[in-house]
Amino acid sequence: MSTLQDQLDEITARTRELVQAERLAVGERAVEELFASGIEERILPVGSLAPEFALNDSRGRLVRSADMLALGPLIVKFFRGRWCPYCVTELEAWRELHGTLRERGVLMVAISPQTEQQNDFMVSQHALPFAVLRDPGCALAEKFGVAYTVPEYLREYYLSILINVPFVNGEASWRLPLPAIYVISPAGRVLFAEAHADFRVRPEPEEALAAATHST
């Protein structure tokens, strides 16, 4: 059975076959610059007290982290948007583990800066069984240390391939989160934290699930 990273690597391989080298170079430059910024070193580390949050789900209902943590450990997954095939593949991998999450008493939310309508499209199209929350302008992602601003040259590239981030997000900041995952204990402490400047690299869901399970 293929791992999540195997599936993501397949997306990368197909992209390299189909996309012109000069276009690929734009994305590579962005990844290199984001890594060089040191953002991976600034993510909220294990042992920290996680920021509390109250965000709307895809139907406009307010979801509070405190209410979920009262029921057990919480997995928080930050993702860029429904336009990102890597994010879609990762969330679908988590969908397949939803039964295991429930059996182990672990809750999960996915969080993006997309509008509620865009999140609702994603929930419906990919049959996501967990709440998908909106983080306007990546305000919460900033508190977790995983928010960044898309550089001008990458904005032009995105728009050229019909990825209109301001439209999808409903605001003009061009802020996105790193693809990040956190596990938070019922006491509000970070048990697991991983984020990568390279959006093509993601931890296996089982790693985060193991951290959540050990907290129960």
Where are each of the predicted segments found?
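Short active-site neighborhood of thiol/selenol oxidoreductases, capturing the structured segment around
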Residues: 65-90, 94
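Long amphipathic N-terminal alpha/beta scaffold segment
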Residues: 32-73
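Thiol/selenol-based redox catalytic cores and closely related redox-interacting motifs
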Residues: 135-201
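Short, positively charged
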Residues: 28-34, 154-164, 213-216
